[in-house]
Amino acid sequence: MAVEALHCGLNPRGIDHPAHAEGIKLQIEGEGVESQSIKNKNFQKVPDQKGTPKRLQAEAETAKSATVKLSKPVALWTQQDVCKWLKKHCPNQYQIYSESFKQHDITGRALLRLTDKKLERMGIAQENLRQHILQQVLQLKVREEVRNLQLLTQGTLLLPDGWMDGEIRRKTTLLLGQTGVRENLLLFLHRISIIENSIQI
């Protein structure tokens, strides 16, 4: 469902138009598994802790493949996390970028707000290098938005202190019906449209 959502978007007037996402590659854990919560208008139950160990292990593996990996949100990344991301996505210019990013204290939140002008002020003079970084940041933003939408449809909450752990989630009832999912999808599409317009690839 979330991957299909990338092929359309909303303009400021609310009219659907194609989202220009050429060249963006997404690798989403659980891709291709349609959420039962949308079909049934309910959320899947957490498996009972009764049963054989083999059954519990099989249920845990099935649940793991259908959910999004709960990694740290980009906005909470440290300088070190940003440098790891740089090394993976910009290996050829990593030394230059990492020094500049460290000098300017670029954390995850700052990474998401980078612009062409900011990169130029940071000393990255070549336009093609700045555009490469911005393309990678755009892909990161899209992955983050897709993950957030998946977490919303699964009923996982992000609290100020971090992710809810499983025990609290079992005790908390989250009622997010079909209307809530639709509203979240529209919000997601609007955010993607804003991201595309801000980067202007």
UniProtKB/Swiss-Prot annotation:
In this record, what's one Pfam family? Answer: SAM_2
Q: Which UniProt keywords apply?
A: Epilepsy
Q: Which GO terms describe its biological process?
A: cell surface receptor protein tyrosine kinase signaling pathway
Q: What is the protein named?
A: Sterile alpha motif domain-containing protein 12
List, alphabetically, the PROSITE patterns matched. Answer: SAM_DOMAIN (PS50105)
Mind telling me which InterPro entries this protein's record contains? Aveugle-like_SAM_dom (IPR039144), SAM (IPR001660), SAM/pointed_sf (IPR013761), SAM_domain-containing_protein (IPR052268)
Describe the disease involvement stated in the record for this chain: Epilepsy, familial adult myoclonic, 1: A form of familial myoclonic epilepsy, a neurologic disorder characterized by cortical hand tremors, myoclonic jerks and occasional generalized or focal seizures with a non-progressive or very slowly progressive disease course. Usually, myoclonic tremor is the presenting symptom, characterized by tremulous finger movements and myoclonic jerks of the limbs increased by action and posture. In a minority of patients, seizures are the presenting symptom. Some patients exhibit mild cognitive impairment. FAME1 inheritance is autosomal dominant.
Q: Which organism is it from?
A: Homo sapiens
